[in-house]
Amino acid sequence: MDIGVDLIWGDDSESEVFAQAQSKDLSLIFRYSLNLKLPQSLSSRVVNCYYNLSPKDASETFSDRAAMREALYSSVCRVWDQCAMHPSISAPDVTVEIYEDAERQDQWRISHESLYKQYVESLLPISSLFQSGEAKLQAYYTVDYSSLVQIGHLGGRGRTAVVRCSSGSGSLHVFKGVDFGTFLESRADFEHRKDVCYHEIRTISSLPRHPNIIHPADVFATVQKIEDDRQAFVCGTLYPFMEHGTLDDQVKNTKTTGARLALRNKAIWCFQMASAIAHTHFTAHTFHMDIKPANFVLDSNQNLILIDWEQSGAPLYTLAPEANGSWDVKEAKVESSSSDGADSAVSKLVYERYAGHYRENLAWGRPKWNVYPFWSEFYPRALVAAEVFSLGRTMWMLLQQVAQSEVEDLDEVVVYWSEDARDIPDDWKAVVDRCLDPDPNKRIGLMDLLNFWEKVKCKDWTNSMCNPDFSGRSLSLRVAA
């Protein structure tokens, strides 16, 4: 019996823990509730350990999270066969509560959650999702969320998981959205994640097409009301699964092999990153905000595709320092002398540290004060400079081969070029350093950056000493029990 438990979460009350498990074509949500009358029961011990509560006795919790997960997994395996035969087990509003009776024997019961109705009613039908704005609905079809077989979760906000359709060809897709489990976890968090999900769908649909930017989804995952299934409500989208993973996956693969990624590939990928961001600013007239190696996936031809258009947070390890919410910007005219001696006025970005009351417009992400929308409308030059910095950090991580896990928890990222990067040409290092200049006015322009990489990628690599072949490996999907 192959049962996977790859997602465990709590709720706002800190009195319940949920676990999503799957086997073959069946995916179930299990519930563990705190029972004050049976503090040593499995469910109470799971809750106490998950929330790091302080019970009266050590027998009312587990020694650590690993022991808790093992006990939880074992309990799911013990009741799975019985649960799977229940006639209502596949209903979308069902959860399975696992508990112990007075004799400490495993018991389970099916619950049809009344909250499921609230979950569905909080979602939008496709027609309402595209009622206004620049987003345009292309040809599409829908898939019932309950028909999706969970293969493994990919992390990130909301629910992002590798799935396949139970009635389809078996091909893998990536589901990105908000499922019922998200609603059970936190109502407030769900509302935010739902808004972000819909914002991303609309944003991608409004972008002019570009070969290195993800195309609008043409498959929507939907749910229906239990009592009336005539109308479908959007809970997410399906995108093709990219088996080569992300740019960060390619770098992480080299950590085990000790190999250097081919220079030609690095040049092409740097060009494609710059091209996608230039299109974002100068053609689509918007921004990305979350530029990092993990948000560039590789398609079947090893070309980069920019994903994650939530525009609701930025990673601190690629975020431009002036865009961290502590600075305001304005443009000022300054005198400049040309080569012929004539004076002229040029525009310069002037930054001033904010000294007012605490401000916050990004409650669920970081930085807490998001300057991107305001700068996009009133100071686009400052926004472009900030995203050039993020591109520079991302390019450095690729060229130096630094995995995100090496920098994502650091208070400060120090850019360096080690002996391992001796294969990187000096002019490549120099252009990255120009992206990272502390003064945004001195950073290389985005179009100049694009032109640099276009020339590099078009060079004759025939006599190059580097291996010109694709050296990354396919993504190995890891599902934690």
Which residues make up each language-model segment?
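ATP-binding glycine-rich loop module of kinase domains
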Residues: 146-207, 211-214
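Conserved structural core of kinase catalytic domains
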Residues: 215-264
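Activation segment signature within eukaryotic-like protein kinase domains
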Residues: 269-270
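Catalytic-loop of the protein kinase fold
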Residues: 280-299
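C-lobe/activation-segment region of protein kinase-like
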Residues: 303-305, 310-419
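Conserved C-terminal C-lobe helix
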Residues: 423-437
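A conserved short helix/loop substructure at the end of the activation segment
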Residues: 436-449
